[in-house]
């Protein structure tokens, strides 16, 4: 019935993804600053004028829970917003969600989305 879509993307692509998701009608998103590495290994970073080696790269994680019927469209929206063809474009993970509960009202599933 529901799936959770997690997209790890470059931070500067967040605004474009957010606008496209909201235009599609996604009712809400969770955004978290994360760090990680994969094929795109870190390099020289600067902070307050000091250079240092960084094995982890700053990314942004977007999480949304939607009805399964919308997953393919949302994946396409995200890919179209962030794709450069370069290492580091990110990853999308899709997981099943068995139930959703809004704490304030105790609404469940579709009423809680």
Swiss-Prot record:
Q: Does the keyword Translocase apply?
A: no
Question: GO cellular-component terms in the record?
Answer: chloroplast; cytosol
Entry GO MF terms: ATP binding; enzyme regulator activity
**UniProt-listed GO biological process terms:** regulation of nitrogen utilization
Q: Where in the cell is it found?
A: Plastid, Chloroplast
Q: Which InterPro entries match?
A: N-reg_PII, N-reg_PII-like_a/b, N-reg_PII/ATP_PRibTrfase_C, N-reg_PII_CS
The source's superkingdom equals Eukaryota
Q: Where are the O-UMP-tyrosine modifications?
A: 52
Give the record's keywords alphabetically.
Answer: Chloroplast, Nucleotide-binding, Phosphoprotein, Plastid, Transcription, Transcription regulation
Q: Does the keyword ATP-binding apply?
A: no
Q: What family is this protein classified in?
A: Belongs to the P(II) protein family.
Q: What does this protein do, in the record's words?
A: P-II indirectly controls the transcription of the glutamine synthetase gene (glnA). P-II prevents NR-II-catalyzed conversion of NR-I to NR-I-phosphate, the transcriptional activator of glnA. When P-II is uridylylated to P-II-UMP, these events are reversed. When the ratio of Gln to 2-ketoglutarate decreases, P-II is uridylylated to P-II-UMP, which causes the deadenylation of glutamine synthetase, so activating the enzyme.
Subunit composition and interactions: Homotrimer.
Question: What protein name does the entry list?
Answer: Nitrogen regulatory protein P-II
């Amino acid at each position: 019935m529901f799936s959770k879509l997690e997209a790890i993307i470059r931070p500067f692509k967040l605004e474009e993804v957010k606008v496209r998701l909201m235009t599609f009608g996604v009712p809400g998103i969770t955004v978290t600053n994360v760090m990680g590495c994969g094929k795109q290994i870190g390099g020289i970073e600067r902070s307050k004028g000091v250079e240092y080696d960084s094995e982890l790269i700053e990314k942004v994680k977007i999480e949304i829970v939607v009805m399964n019927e919308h997953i393919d469209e949302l994946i396409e929206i995200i890919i179209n917003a962030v794709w450069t063809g370069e290492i580091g474009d990110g990853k999308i993970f899709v997981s099943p969600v068995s139930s959703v509960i809004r704490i304030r009202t105790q609404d469940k599933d579709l009423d809680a989305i």
